Curated annotation (Swiss-Prot):
CDD domains: KH-I_Rrp4_prokar (cd22524), S1_Rrp4 (cd05789). Belongs to the RRP4 family. One of its GO terms (molecular function) is poly(A) binding. Residues 151-213 form the KH domain. The keyword Cell inner membrane does not apply. It comes from Sulfolobus acidocaldarius (strain ATCC 33909 / DSM 639 / JCM 8929 / NBRC 15157 / NCIMB 11770). This is Exosome complex component Rrp4.
């Protein structure tokens, strides 16, 4: 980092709109959460600043329910409308996305073919952002392993900015959630989570744990607290559901 470059906040500090974050020339990607004026970077939101190696910074919104699309992101979308050649998909963004039928079918749609046979309003899909440049709506693709319609399980919503905390550093949090619950869990980058559990009680406990992560994401020691919470909660559930043996008389 150049001697002229300076970051004015420590890692994991809170910034508010108008705060001077840094000064100089930094190789940071475009973001809607800060702006640059005459070599000075200012926060556009109330958020958390992360600093890496003293030379790279990022501003993360503390409260945001909207997802900003990025090409290559894997998302969970909700079919909200049907068009002749594809589907309009809600991706929890200011933009609705479009999924061409040809991406799902692997061929062009035939004249008069009813695409509702493949996806209907209310269905969820796992997809990737294939194209987006802020001048057109995001275009999705479901070509690839693990992509396509979600047939089973539950989809829950969290704030997109909380996704990194639910996954955890080196996937530490998601591994705790998976190993303790035994559920299949997929966290999409737009703040939707697909879960499949053995029963509803385990699912409810897992959802409660994820909501705790979302509300306490800024606190330290959260991973171990979640591990202990699930051990206790699921231990009670599993003991209550275990077959009871009659005492000898």
């Amino acid at each position: 980092m150049s001697q002229a470059n300076k970051i004015y906040f420590e890692d994991r500090s809170i910034v508010t709109p108008g705060d001077l974050i840094a000064e100089g020339e930094f190789q940071v990607p475009w973001s809607p959460y800060y702006y640059k004026v005459n070599g000075k970077y200012y926060s556009a939101i109330t958020g958390l600043i992360t600093v890496k190696d003293g030379s790279i910074f990022e501003v993360i919104p503390l409260e945001s329910s909207r997802y900003y699309p990025k090409v290559g992101d894997t998302i969970i979308g909700l079919v909200e409308d049907i068009e002749i050649y594809g589907w309009v998909i809600d991706i929890k963004s200011f933009y609705s996305a479009y999924l061409p039928a040809s991406s799902l079918l692997g061929r062009p749609i035939s004249p008069g073919e009813d695409v509702r046979r493949y996806l209907d309003v209310g269905d969820y899909v796992i997809a990737k952002i294939e194209a987006f440049d802020r001048t057109i709506s995001p275009v999705l693709t479901v070509k690839g392993k693990g992509l396509g319609r979600i047939p089973l399980g539950t989809v829950m919503d969290i704030m997109p900015v909380k996704v990194p905390r639910v996954i955890g550093k080196n996937r530490s949090m998601i591994e705790v959630l998976t190993s303790e619950s035994g559920c299949e869990i997929f966290v999409a980058q737009n703040g939707r989570i697909h879960i499949k559990c053995a029963n509803n009680l385990i699912e409810e406990a897992l959802i409660e744990a994820i909501n705790i992560i979302q509300s306490e994401s800024h606190t330290k020691g959260l991973t171990e607290r979640i591990r202990n919470f699930l051990k206790q909660k699921l231990g009670v559930i599993r003991n209550d559901s275990a077959p009871k043996t009659e005492a000898n008389t």
